[in-house]
Amino acid sequence: LENGEIIPYTKAIVAPGIDFKYDKGYIEGSEAYAPHAYKAGEQTVLLSEQLQNMKDGGTFVMVAPNNPFRCPPGPYERVSLVAHYLKHNKPNSKIIILDQKNKFSKQGLFQEGWEKLYKDMIDWRSVEFGGKVISVNPKTKVIKTDDGDVIADVLNYIPEQKAGKLAFDSGLVDGDWCPINTKTFESKLVKNVYVIGDACIAGPMPKSGFSANSQGKIAALQISRILVDLPLVNPPKLAN
C-alpha cells in the first residue's frame, strides 16, 4: 500500500482503472490548457469555467478517442450537456466533434436528439471524413487534421486510453489492457489475481460502471467456489 503496509492474500481482486496515452502533441500537463476532464475533479471545474468564459459565437471542440475507452457514450453525453448550456447562454456558438472513429455508442439516438434540439450547432466529423487528428497544440488550441486546421476557443481533448498504472506495475498488462479468463476474471498473466472494471479485456463488454459491477459479482462468486473446491458456474449472459 502507499503507506508501506503489505497485505498478504490468497486471491486478490483489483480494479486498476484507466490512464491516458499522451501523443500527437497532447502531453502530460496539457490538461491545464485543454482539459480532458475524463477523471472527475479539478479538470471538470476547469472545463466548466472555460465554457462560461467563452464568448458567444465561440467554438467548443471535442476530440473523442478511438475505442476502447471508458464509458463509450460519455463524450456524446457531454456534448449534449454543452449544447444545452450554449443554446440557452451562448446561442451563436458552435460545437465540433473530431472523432477518432467512424461510429459511436448510441449514435442514432444522439444524432436524432441533436437534430431536434440543436439543429446546426453540432458538427460531428468521423475519422474518415475530416475528423482524423494529426497533431494538437493545447496552448494555442489549434488542431491539425487531415482536412486542415481547426481552431477552438475551448478544447476538450480526450486522449486514447490504457489500463491504469497499478496494472502496469503489477505485470497484468499485455499491450494496453489486461487479458483475463472471462469465466472467472483471473488474470492470464498473474495467477490468483483477478482484474475487473475498465482495465480488463472482457470481450464485447463495454468499459462501463454496470460492467464493472457485474464483473465484481462474477469474480467473487467464482472465487468463493474455488476456495471450497466447488466447480465453477457458468456466468449469466449480461446486457448493458
What does each model-found stretch correspond to?
Residues 1, 7, 84-176, 231-233:
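A Rossmann-like FAD-binding core segment of flavoenzymes
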Residues 1-70, 74-77, 84-88, 156:
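FAD-binding core/adjacent interface of flavoenzyme oxidoreductases
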Residues 23-25, 71-73, 107, 166-168, ...:
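Short glycine-/acidic-enriched loop or helix-start segments at secondary-structure transitions
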Residues 29-56, 150-214:
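FAD-site-proximal beta/loop scaffold in flavoenzymes
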Residues 59, 92-96, 192:
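Residues at the starts of beta-strands that form the adenosine-phosphate
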Residues 65, 100-102, 198:
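Cofactor-binding loop segments of dinucleotide-utilizing enzymes, especially the Rossmann-like FAD-
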Residues 66-90, 178, 187-195, 204, ...:
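Active-site substrate-recognition segment that forms the wall
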Residues 199-239:
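A conserved FAD-binding loop/helix module that cradles the flavin
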